[in-house]
Amino acid sequence: MIEGKMKIRVGIIGYGKMGQLRHQASEATGLSEVIAISEPNLVDGVGEGLPNLSHDEIVSREDIDAIVICTPNFLNKELTIAALRAGKHVFCEKPPAFTGKDMEEIIAVEQESGKCLMYGFNHRHHDSVMKIKEIIASGEYGSVLWMRGRYGKSVTDDYYKQWRSKKELAGGGILMDQGIHMMDLFLYLGGKFDTVKAEISNLYWKMDVEDNAFVILKNNDTGCVASLHSTMTQWRHLFSLEIFLEKGYMVLNGLITGSMSYSIEGAEQLSIAKSRSAAPAATFEDEERLRYHTDNSWNYEMEHFYEAIEQGFEISKGSSKDALDLMRVMDKCYEQKSF
């Protein structure tokens, strides 16, 4: 930020775990100042010194430049549209909406408003993922042939009591909640996907939303195929992303999160190797193994949002176009739901 320049004034709607995390990341950028929050179930001692207003009050305040939305999924679309119409820049947590049609409606309002709209897909901003993107973009390893992503967690019976277990409030289950991050990475690293085959099922928890999603995607132009397993019956938490290219591979095991339950011995481990002989007996140079111990994604993501507002450039990670492409793929998945 230019010295002496006024900070971007921010209101946060939804001040639970994610709202508080976004607050911390916003302040870490040095570009913004949170001046108000909206949280009907505010915990004692949280958000002290900040006015706790209604959603409408946050949206209508003239001294707020940008709104960060961290609410249950069913509120995301309506709050995004309301904030854009009120002339605010908007950062909204995933999922951006429930369907591709929802995103089309949001984009129409965004274009009328002329304001920045960005969505929270922080996995794109992990240092390990940015390294993968850099290598793919360099062309050194050739084109991406295939990708395989596995992302899973376990839940408890308490999950039945949460809004995430209700279709009308969450929009979907584990695929909408967690698998959407891996799907977003597929699009980020592999481009568009035209063909989608999915098995969306409820194998164990028997609730209103899916607990498992098995998805195969194909880019008809490049031939790249990606497979995804998103599950809430992964009793031992797992994050694994494999990318195999014409001349080598990259495998990312583990992800640094707040719980650290997805990490590999406290780190994200990225293995990189380049092939040096022809198939079928291909051998590889010694793998380069990079370990990442810190999650900087939240700060990077908020910095990108606030810099876009300040400098007037287009969002390049988590744009409304990214969200539209993603939700159209999600639509194709849920059209094949088997329960």
Regions found by a protein language model. Name each.
Residues 1-4, 66-69, 221, 290-292, ...:
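C-terminal helix-rich "cap/oligomerization" subdomain common to oxidoreductases
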Residues 2-48, 339:
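N-terminal Rossmann-like dinucleotide-binding module
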Residues 49-109, 297:
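Beta-loop-alpha module in the N-terminal Rossmann-like domain of NAD(P)-dependent dehydrogenases
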Residues 69, 92-93, 117-119, 148, ...:
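Hydrophobic residues in well-ordered beta-strands that form the structural core
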Residues 105-122, 142-147:
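Rossmann-fold dehydrogenase core element
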Residues 122, 242-317, 321:
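C-terminal glycine/acidic-rich active-site capping loop/insertion
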Residues 123-206:
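Predominantly a Rossmann-like dinucleotide-binding segment in NAD(P)-dependent oxidoreductases
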Residues 215-223, 243-245:
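Active-site beta-strand termini and strand-to-loop segments that position acidic
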